[in-house]
């Protein structure tokens, strides 16, 4: 039996991951930590034998209580409702995004044991400042974040690499897909689907030659579960 923690378990990826764990939740101790309380979803978690803790990753005492004996931490919590372009940003918003990401991640790293595996979702936008489009980027490419969300993720990657802990970083493309619990209409494919279903018209610029990295939500959730299962991947 593993002691598994999912921070941000009521979010877009976390919700789908919990659905996958619902099939094996009786074989493990699974706890979701989220600073939101959505009664229907919390009740569903409890029906799946998944514990719910209403709390924040910035609360180090709470993180210590639940993470110190963890075998696995899926660290999904953080601010995701972020500015997509520089003109929508300001110092206050940027500082909050970076602070929550860094402090929350450090709180977890400070209390987990060396045997614990922490699995973290980074993002392809850590490359957003590259001077030209590349189709063959791998994990050894130097990152070049510009906006606060990407800067926060790049900083979190460094925290994990410098921690000496057992970690896995997944640099995800733009996650998309239908979720019965969480709508993310701000994501391009989801927005396109909504417009198309309403007989809307999509306007393409630059001849429709834009390139975007996409990955289905269900595949991301399955990947997190797979990373938890494989002891030879770290």
Name each model feature, range by range.
Residues 47-58:
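Rossmann-fold cofactor-recognition segment
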Residues 58, 92, 96-107, 143, ...:
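Glycine-rich NAD(P)-binding loop of the Rossmann-fold in SDR/ketoreductase-type enzymes
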Residues 7, 33, 73-77, 118-124, ...:
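SDR active-site strand-loop-helix element
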């Amino acid at each position: 039996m593993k002691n598994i923690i999912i921070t941000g378990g009521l979010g877009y990826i976390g919700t789908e991951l919990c659905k996958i764990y619902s099939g094996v939740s009786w074989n493990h101790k699974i706890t979701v930590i989220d600073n939101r309380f959505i009664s229907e979803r919390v009740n569903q978690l409890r029906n799946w034998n998944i514990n719910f803790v209403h709390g924040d990753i910035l609360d180090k005492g709470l993180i210590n209580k639940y993470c110190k004996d963890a075998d696995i931490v899926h660290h999904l919590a953080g601010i995701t409702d972020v500015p997509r372009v520089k003109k929508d940003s300001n110092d206050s918003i940027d500082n909050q995004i970076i602070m929550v990401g860094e402090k929350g991640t450090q709180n977890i790293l400070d209390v987990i044991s060396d045997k614990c595996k922490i699995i973290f979702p980074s993002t392809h936008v850590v490359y957003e400042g590259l001077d030209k489009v590349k189709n063959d980027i791998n994990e050894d490419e130097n990152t070049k974040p510009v906006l606060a969300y990407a800067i926060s993720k790049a900083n979190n990657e460094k925290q994990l690499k410098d921690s000496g802990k057992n970690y896995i970083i997944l640099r995800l493309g733009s996650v998309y897909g239908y979720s019965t619990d969480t709508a993310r209409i701000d994501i391009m494919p989801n927005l396109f689907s909504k417009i198309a279903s309403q007989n809307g018209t999509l306007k393409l610029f630059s001849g429709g030659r834009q390139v975007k990295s996409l990955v289905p939500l269900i595949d991301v959730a399955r990947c997190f579960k797979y990373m938890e299962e494989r002891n030879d991947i770290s």
